[in-house]
């Protein structure tokens, strides 16, 4: 028997439970993501983050509705490839790197510090989706420029990051510092002139 959930007089059929608080659901042949919150503060932070990210220009799954009483939200279900998984095969397409720099630029301009690690992004339909729905107050770009940006290229920092997550990657594919710095410099000039 198919389990159904009703939110604001709309019925959704549960297709799959993704984790403890997330479900893939379907309504009228379209897939959605149902997120349940058990903590009121976390739900309010999600609602605030969803709004701030949406108006900033950072692409994230569209939120169709949320129920403040139940602390549930219905979002677009994004099927695509996680950028960390894409990078494990060697390198990311230039289009993905362009979109990554744009996401950082939008965040910086709206004073939002988002977690720029590649496993927080999914590439689908020509868009780069930021999945966590979290942000901090932006103070400066040094952490991204000197740290996280190197995780978007096949660098020794990327290999170390993967190993810290228990992911085995081929260290022989590591790009030279010269090649990585050249790519970073070219992308930076393109977006920050």
Predicted regions and their residues:
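Hydrophobic residue at the +6 position relative to the catalytic HRD Asp in the kinase catalytic loop
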Residues: 116-121
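Conserved hydrophobic core/spine positions of the Hanks-type protein kinase catalytic domain
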Residues: 99-106
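C-lobe/activation-segment region of protein kinase-like
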Residues: 109-112, 124-193
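Protein kinase-like catalytic core scaffold
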Residues: 32, 59, 73, 129-131
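Structural motif at the C-terminus of the N-lobe alphaC helix and the adjacent alphaC-beta4 loop
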Residues: 49-59
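Conserved structural core of kinase catalytic domains
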Residues: 58-99
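Conserved hydrophobic "DFG−1" position in protein kinase catalytic cores
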Residues: 24-25, 36, 65, 74-77, ...
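ATP-binding glycine-rich loop module of kinase domains
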Residues: 8-47
């Amino acid at each position: 028997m198919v389990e159904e959930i009703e939110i604001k007089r709309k019925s959704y059929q549960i297709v799959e439970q993704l984790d403890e608080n997330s479900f893939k659901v379907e309504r009228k042949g379209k897939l959605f993501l149902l997120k349940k919150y058990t903590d009121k503060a976390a739900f309010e932070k999600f609602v605030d983050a969803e709004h701030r990210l949406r108006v900033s220009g950072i692409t994230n799954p569209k939120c169709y509705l949320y129920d403040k009483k139940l602390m549930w939200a219905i979002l677009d279900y994004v099927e695509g490839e996680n950028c960390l998984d894409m990078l494990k095969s060697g390198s990311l397409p230039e289009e993905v790197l362009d979109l990554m720099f744009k996401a950082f630029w939008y965040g910086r301009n709206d004073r939002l510090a988002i977690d720029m690690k590649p496993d927080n992004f999914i590439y689908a339909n020509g868009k780069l989706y930021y999945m966590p729905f979290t942000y901090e107050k932006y103070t400066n770009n040094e952490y991204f420029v000197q740290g996280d940006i190197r995780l978007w290229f096949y660098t020794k920092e990327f290999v170390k990051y993967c190993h810290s997550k228990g992911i085995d990657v081929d260290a022989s594919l590591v790009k030279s510092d010269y090649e990585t710095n050249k790519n970073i410099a070219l992308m930076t000039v393109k977006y920050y002139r």
